[in-house]
Amino acid sequence: MVNLGSYVFVFVALSLTVVVPSVQAHIAEYDEYWTQRQTNALRETLESYDPNPENVTDHFNYHAALAMETTGIVNETRRDLRQVGRGKKTTRRGGRFESLNAIDKCWRGDKNWDKNRKKLADCVLGFGRKTTGGKNGPIYVVTDPSDNDLLKPKPGTIRHAVTRDRPLWIIFARSMIIKLQQELIITNDKTIDGRGAKIYITGGAGLTLQFVRNVIIHNIHIKQIKRGAGGLIIDSEQHFGLRTVSDGDGINIFGATNVWIDHVSMTDCSDGMIDAIMGSTAITISNSHFTDHDEVMLFGGTNKDVIDKKMQITVAFNHFGKRLKQRMPRVRFGLVHVVNNDYTHWEMYAIGGNMNPTIISQGNRFIAPPIEDSKQVTKREYTPYPEWKSWNWQSEKDYFLNGAYFVQSGKANAWSATPKNPIPRKFAIRPQPGTKVRRLTKDAGTLGCKPGKSC
């Protein structure tokens, strides 16, 4: 058994020089407003960073094990859960909802989900577990799919909703196809909840989370995203600014904290599908489906951005599907917990990186492509073996098919010299094995939720 507390996080004890993000990030004019947002975001990054990340990964595996033990557990302590999922047969007592993963099982069995939408905010696991989005605000109903005014957006449009300076839980009156004229700049404390409708963000620009905190993006399609030309764009209720050309990412997370992306279907973006850079941390990406793309996820933008040592991201219960090539994810610095995902397609590699990131791969299924040179799951980029051999890239209970293999490095059980509140080994919870991934990810992507029926 790999013990996360033992190898992960030697860099935690090291001194960390914090570098304020220097990239302008498509902000043509860095005025007082953006300077203050950047300062606030840096503070949020430092406060959101968990110095004991092994506790977070163990917490995730605890709940994953609990969800799989469908016969029920009376005493939900760590000691009692040590044997959860270790060879026990599960009993289907409640129909298909007994087989859901730990996040979905929290809310999907409720046929009145539409009357209690905010229950969703209680269900996130992983590094983004403190994300609540717009839970503390009112419901905002998007009634108009247009995006015609970038400075004074029409009430009822999604651009009007996401730029309000207060928490909002944003839902949709009906199914919509939304073509964004320019990047959609989202403010703090927002939930975009597409349940009950088919919501497509397509044919235009993507979503931008820049120097913000506490955002949930749930149950929408994002496809065929293009670069935006820039110009004057509203970025909060009281401010607009001049933007340069946007990258064409589906979701661009820049200096943002406490972000949860769940049940999103993504296809064919001009640049990355999801980029998390420049001090972004406390993020969970779950239950999503990705197809038809080259560079899927980039975590850490450049070799100079040492602020990304604070990056902590959970990637869980996702399906990496047809016609994907690479970066699922590609990581610089930081730590990524890749757990219970289904990797059915890649052309070059699945998980890669440089600049000494920590990558914990647990209970994933990797099905290698027929290309002999591409069967290795991992790729250390632009780094010689003598350097990367000490990086902590670990695989536990992964399931490898068609010749797939994961090249590990680092010391799996080398305890940090000064661990802070480590989980005792006898209480550590094992991840669910990769052999169960097909079941755990069977509903990845958007859901066809209907009011009055279990989702």
From Swiss-Prot:
Pathway: Glycan metabolism; pectin degradation; 2-dehydro-3-deoxy-D-gluconate from pectin: step 2/5. It catalyses: Eliminative cleavage of (1->4)-alpha-D-galacturonan to give oligosaccharides with 4-deoxy-alpha-D-galact-4-enuronosyl groups at their non-reducing ends. Residues 1-25 form the signal peptide. One of its GO terms (molecular function) is pectate lyase activity. Ca(2+) binds at residues 247, 271, 275. The keyword Magnesium does not apply. Its cofactor is Ca(2+). Binds 1 Ca(2+) ion. Required for its activity. The active site is at 327. Its EC number is 4.2.2.2. SMART domains: Amb_all. Transmembrane segments: none annotated. Glycans are attached at residues 55, 75. SUPFAM superfamilies: Pectin lyase-like. InterPro entries: AmbAllergen, Pec_lyase, Pec_lyase_N, Pectin_lyas_fold, Pectin_lyase_fold/virulence, PEL. It comes from the Eukaryota. Gene3D superfamilies: Single-stranded right-handed beta-helix, Pectin lyase-like (2.160.20.10). Keywords: Calcium, Glycoprotein, Lyase, Metal-binding, Signal. Pfam families: Pec_lyase_N, Pectate_lyase_4. One of its GO terms (biological process) is pectin catabolic process. Belongs to the polysaccharide lyase 1 family. This is Probable pectate lyase 6. It comes from Arabidopsis thaliana (Mouse-ear cress).
